[in-house]
């Protein structure tokens, strides 16, 4: 993807000194521009499974309601990965994450990212420490 989450992820990966970062997205121009801006490798969307990498971070809406039966890559491609992260928080377990779990590949859904974003915003707006446990209970209770 090429939205704000993608940009944050790219900055984080760069800060952590990750090498060989690839980006792919359905919008050729936006993705190519993002790759140039952050000095990462660009892969055309229809070539994404012809590349060799270990970690997949899905920052597209593919898998989010109402596209819950879709994945950004095939099950066969997921088998080659060491780790899968999906930024989507709803549904809590996307098809991508469920597939990675079934294949015994390390994985993390966007649920915790959403919770941590909410906690940071709470502190930013209230100048108080967020009630993380209560926030998580509420999120679990209301998550579909």
What are these regions (language model features)?
Residues 1-14:
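Glycine-rich adenosine-cofactor-binding loop
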Residues 16-38:
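NAD(P)-binding Rossmann-fold cofactor-contacting core
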Residues 38-42, 125-128:
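Short, hinge-like loop/turn segments at secondary-structure boundaries
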Residues 83, 87-144:
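Adenosine-phosphate binding glycine-rich loop
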């Amino acid at each position: 993807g090429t939205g704000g989450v993608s940009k944050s992820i790219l900055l984080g990966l760069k800060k952590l000194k990750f090498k060989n970062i690839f980006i792919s997205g359905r919008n050729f121009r936006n993705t190519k521009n993002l790759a140039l801006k952050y000095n990462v490798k660009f892969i055309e969307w229809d070539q994404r499974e012809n590349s060799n990498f270990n970690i997949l971070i899905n920052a597209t809406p593919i898998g989010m309601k109402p596209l819950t039966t879709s994945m950004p890559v095939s099950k066969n491609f997921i088998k080659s990965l060491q780790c899968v992260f999906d930024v989507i928080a709803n549904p809590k377990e996307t098809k991508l994450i469920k597939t990675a779990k079934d294949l015994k590949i390390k994985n993390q859904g966007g649920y915790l990212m959403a919770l941590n974003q909410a906690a940071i915003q709470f502190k930013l707006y209230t100048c108080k420490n967020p009630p993380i446990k209560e926030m998580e209970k509420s999120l679990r209770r209301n998550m579909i």
